[in-house]
C-alpha cells in the first residue's frame, strides 16, 4: 500500500507519522492551498504536491487515498477517488448522511476498490476480544460512554470565529466529531438501536458543542456523552446483571480494561493484547485487507459504518422533532 494524502488539517500529520511507523510509503499530498501544504511536504519528504485534485488522482505513485478533510467533504472526495480507481481511507465520520454512505459502498463494490473508515476501535484485537468478555457478565442493562475534550478551537468560537469544527455546514459539532467514537463502540458490538434521541447543548449558530445521546435497545439503554466545550475523563462502562466491564479510556482506544464479577465480588484485569500504537495498527490492518483483497471483511466493516451514520442521522433528526 502506497498512500496519497488529502488535506492539511490537524489529523493529517498524526496519520502520516502513524503510516511511517508502519513503514507505509506516503508519496503525494493534495491541499487546496499550496502554502499550507508545503510544510507537510517538506517535513515528511513527500515527493509530489498538488492543488488540482484530478491531477492528484492521476498520480500512479500511490494506490490508496487517505482523506483527512472536514466532515462534509468526505463523501465527494472519496467518490472521486473511487471513480479514479483508488482505494480509500476516510477519516471518521464516514459521511454525514446515510445516502452518501450507501452510495460510496455501492461504488466501491462496483469499481472493485477497497473502502475504509478510519475509526480506531474497529481495528483493535482487544475490541474483538470484548465480545467474548460480554458473555461473562450476563444480561446487559446499561452502557455509558464518555468522550469529552475541550476543543483547541473553542476559545476562537467563543470569540465569534466560526471554524469548520463548529460549523453545521461543514458537518461540525460534538456529535459528529466525538460522539461518533462512542456510537461506533456500541453499534460495533450490538448493531442498530431501535430508537435514538439526542439532547444537545446548542450554540447560537445551531451547532452542538456538547450533548447526550441515548440509544434504546430491546434489553438495555446506552448513554453516549461527548463535549467539545468542556473536559472530563473518558470511559466506557458496560453494566450487566452478573458483572461490569470498565475501560478507563476514550472509546477509540481499547488498551486496558477491568471486569467485576458480582457473584465472586472480584475484579480482574481483562486479558488483552498490548496495543501501544493503535493508529499504526489501524493502518497495518487496512494494508493487510487490501493486500489480501478481503472484500468480505471490508464489506462487514462498511455495514458497521453505515449503521453508525444511520444513528448520527437519526440523532440530528431527533433534535428537529423535539
PLM regions: where:
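Predominantly a Rossmann-like dinucleotide-binding segment in NAD(P)-dependent oxidoreductases
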Residues: 121-193, 322
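Hydrophobic residues in well-ordered beta-strands that form the structural core
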Residues: 90, 115-117, 247
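Rossmann-fold dehydrogenase core element
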Residues: 103-120, 141-142
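Beta-loop-alpha module in the N-terminal Rossmann-like domain of NAD(P)-dependent dehydrogenases
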Residues: 5, 15, 44, 48-107
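C-terminal helix-rich "cap/oligomerization" subdomain common to oxidoreductases
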Residues: 64-66, 285-322
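N-terminal Rossmann-like dinucleotide-binding module
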Residues: 1-44
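Contiguous beta-strand/loop segments that form the cofactor/metal-binding neighborhood of enzyme cores
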Residues: 183-253, 284-289
Amino acid at each position: 500500500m502506497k498512500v496519497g494524502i488529502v488535506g492539511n488539517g490537524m489529523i493529517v500529520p498524526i496519520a502520516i507519522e502513524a503510516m511511517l511507523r508502519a513503514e507505509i510509503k506516503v508519496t503525494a499530498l493534495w491541499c487546496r492551498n499550496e502554502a499550507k501544504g508545503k510544510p507537510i511536504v517538506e517535513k515528511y519528504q513527500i515527493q509530489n504536491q498538488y492543488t488540482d485534485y484530478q491531477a492528484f488522482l492521476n498520480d500512479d505513485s500511490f494506490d490508496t487515498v487517505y482523506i483527512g478533510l472536514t466532515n462534509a467533504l468526505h463523501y465527494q472526495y472519496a467518490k472521486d477517488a473511487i471513480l479514479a480507481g483508488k482505494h480509500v481511507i476516510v477519516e471518521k465520520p464516514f459521511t454525514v448522511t446515510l445516502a452518501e454512505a450507501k452510495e460510496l459502498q455501492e461504488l466501491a463494490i462496483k469499481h472493485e476498490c477497497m473502502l475504509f473508515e478510519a475509526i480506531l476501535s474497529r481495528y483493535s484485537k482487544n475490541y474483538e476480544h470484548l465480545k467474548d468478555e460480554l458473555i461473562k457478565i450476563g444480561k446487559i442493562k446499561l452502557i455509558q460512554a464518555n468522550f469529552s475534550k475541550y476543543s483547541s478551537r473553542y476559545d476562537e468560537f467563543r470569540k465569534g470565529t466560526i471554524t469548520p469544527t463548529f460549523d453545521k455546514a461543514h458537518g461540525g459539532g460534538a456529535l459528529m466529531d466525538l460522539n461518533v467514537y462512542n456510537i461506533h463502540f456500541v453499534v460495533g458490538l450490538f448493531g442498530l438501536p431501535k430508537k435514538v434521541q439526542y439532547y444537545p447543548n446548542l450554540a447560537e449558530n445551531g451547532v452542538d458543542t456538547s450533548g447526550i445521546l441515548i440509544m434504546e435497545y430491546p434489553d438495555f439503554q446506552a448513554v453516549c456523552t461527548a463535549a467539545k466545550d468542556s473536559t472530563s475523563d473518558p470511559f466506557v462502562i458496560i453494566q450487566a446483571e452478573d458483572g461490569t466491564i470498565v475501560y478507563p479510556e476514550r472509546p477509540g482506544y481499547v488498551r486496558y480494561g477491568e471486569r467485576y464479577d458480582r457473584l465472586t465480588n472480584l475484579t480482574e484485569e481483562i486479558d488483552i493484547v498490548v496495543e501501544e500504537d493503535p493508529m499504526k495498527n489501524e493502518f497495518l490492518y487496512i494494508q493487510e485487507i487490501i493486500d489480501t483483497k478481503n472484500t468480505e471483511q471490508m464489506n462487514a466493516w462498511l455495514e458497521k459504518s453505515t449503521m453508525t451514520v444511520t444513528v448520527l442521522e437519526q440523532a440530528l433528526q431527533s433534535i428537529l422533532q423535539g
